[in-house]
Amino acid sequence: MLKVNSRFWISGFTLAYVLLAVILPLLTPNQGQALAAEGETDNDTESYGTVIGIDLGTTYSCVGVMKNGKVEILANDQGNRITPSYVAFTPEERLIGDAAKNQASSNVENTVFDIKRLIGLKYNDKMVQKEIKHLPYKIDKKDGKPVVKVEFNDETKTFSPEEISGMILTKMKSIAEEYMGKKITHAVVTVPAYFNDAQRQATKDAGTIAGLNVLRIVNEPTAAAIAYGLDKTEGEKQIIVYDLGGGTFDVSLLSIEGGVFEVLATAGDTHLGGEDFDFKVVRYLSSVFKKKHNIDISGNSKAISKLKRETEKAKRTLSSQMSTRIEIDSFVDGIDFSETLSRAKFEELNIESFKKTLKPVQQVLKDAGFKKSDVDDIVLVGGSTRIPKVQELLEKFFDGKKASKGINPDEAVAYGAAVQAGVLSGEEGVHDIVLLDVNPLTLGIETTGGVMTTLINRNTAIPTKKSQIFSTAADNQPTVLIQVFEGERALAKDNNKLGKFELTSIPPAPRGVPQIEVTFSLDANGILKVEAMDKGTGKSESITITNDKGRLSKEDIDRMVEEAEKYAEQDSELKAKIESRNSLENYAHMLKGQVKDESENGLGSKLNDDDKETLDDAIKETLEFIEDNYDSATSEEFEEQKQKLIDVASPITSKLYGGGAGGADEAQFGDDDSDDEFVHDEL
């Protein structure tokens, strides 16, 4: 146990030194950062190539890149600028993004979402235990950490939250590579302001698994402030960033002046967002269904998944309409689901959660010593800020001040991350942006009596380095135990323990005589290094808070990187096969529909019985081939079957149009272009 050394002597020289130490940092921060930026540009950034900015969200993710001084938010292969943070596993393939979410209701136990709620946490953590009750997929315990258990490639597999997050990052990376036409290796990734060190480390590990060097972890509200502040640099502004996303809620108070962004205070709730609003509506609609049909769906994960999907759509609709109808065909036991949900009912179900978001707003104002009237702007970030009641409550809290809506709330964080990425890669036009971030929780060590002694206060600008002198608690004490904690409680045991280490071989001396200097170094990513040095002997020990907090080992990361590459190869091989199969199946069904069309202009009305029978037989044979060889046939075999069907159909359709329209008919019934829309649905 340590005790704080209370004996201080300040000589004239020491006082002068202290004054210099205080004055110099005040005089030179901008000069120092400018020099660092120049050094980076000259020596390091060439090796980075293009650096991308990724908003790795709980429910949706988004990627941006700075090109020629302008940020581009990139669309995925479905044309969407936000991608669901979903990963699904089937007997033959892995799906990520829209394709994974679209099949969730039919593959409930093997579709993984909300993984951000688990990353960097221990299995026994209260939050993990709470999540396990709600998540439809299986969570197991491995080495004290949660892992996802799924069926994939006809075997049971377990994946860590870092691996699943790595798969989502791989998707975002591939979106950027498709756009840029080159390989991407470096990124800036955002996290909630309230993520602790373990969660930040785990996010970096996920980037490594995805083949990305994560140059910087940036707080989401800070990234949003960058997006907001680029064109508003005249004078000083105090801004509240109110970030209500799908799974997390963060509030930050920032000061923006002359391109300098300083986070003054942060607060939030790691388990509050749009999905929680959805859950309350799902619970309500489930009870309504039970009353009407006497069927309890609470244990039916497939039904809950269907209802959850439709509830999310309804919630979005209610942001612009007063009511909407939720309809699901064959919901349970062949019974259709049909209910009207009004905006008023949605607000009634969630009003307590909406009001709960105001507490962190009060907290950041209190932490920074600000009044409501000191706030110049309110910035809305996250899709859930589109909810009218949320905006109304927030504006009422600020005595009628209107929230700024100049940023697309879904894209603001990725935009800011892309700007920071541009800074790190040396992009023109962004070199004058300075980012001052803060640590979200107080950091300290346990001293005599179990007290939490603070070294770095909550909301201290980072990077930072703080030292303090401690001493021994007993005579001739040879060893001191340094136990590192994060949190706001007075006693160390009530806070989150980050790690521990010992400083040994302290020479015998009365208690209070040895001088043990403990130094906390917190880097720009919020990663902590703690060092203890015996000033008498010069001996020191240190720890970087990683494995003691559940971070993956290097061996684990290397293994996961290899597996990620292997899965990428499998994905590539399967993609060609699936596209060929889908192309054949869609063509056969399209042709079947044409043959059955007996309308005046339909193909069926123009065919004689023999030709119709020939086509029916060929289509039936094709569909049977698909059914019998769904998993076993190769891409080439599916393509051969399609050509066989085209060879049967083309002469018949050509004959109908006198042979002159053969090309048109072949395009209609045979060309790949005719069913591209089906091939890329990935259903």
Swiss-Prot record:
GO molecular function: ATP binding; ATP hydrolysis activity; ATP-dependent protein folding chaperone; protein-transporting ATPase activity; unfolded protein binding
Keyword set, alphabetical order: ATP-binding, Chaperone, Endoplasmic reticulum, Hydrolase, Nucleotide-binding, Signal, Stress response
Entry-linked SUPFAM superfamilies: Actin-like ATPase domain, Heat shock protein 70kD (HSP70), C-terminal subdomain, Heat shock protein 70kD (HSP70), peptide-binding domain
Signal peptide from the UniProt entry: 1-34
Segments of this protein annotated with the region Substrate-binding (SBD): 419-519
rRNA processing as UniProt keyword: no
Role according to the record: Probably plays a role in facilitating the assembly of multimeric protein complexes inside the ER. Is required for secretory polypeptide translocation. May physically associate with SEC63 protein in the endoplasmic reticulum and this interaction may be regulated by ATP hydrolysis.
Protein name in the entry: Endoplasmic reticulum chaperone BiP
Organism whose genome encodes this protein: Debaryomyces hansenii (strain ATCC 36239 / CBS 767 / BCRC 21394 / JCM 1990 / NBRC 0083 / IGC 2968)
Lineage per the UniProt record: Eukaryota, Fungi, Dikarya, Ascomycota, Saccharomycotina
Gene behind the chain: KAR2
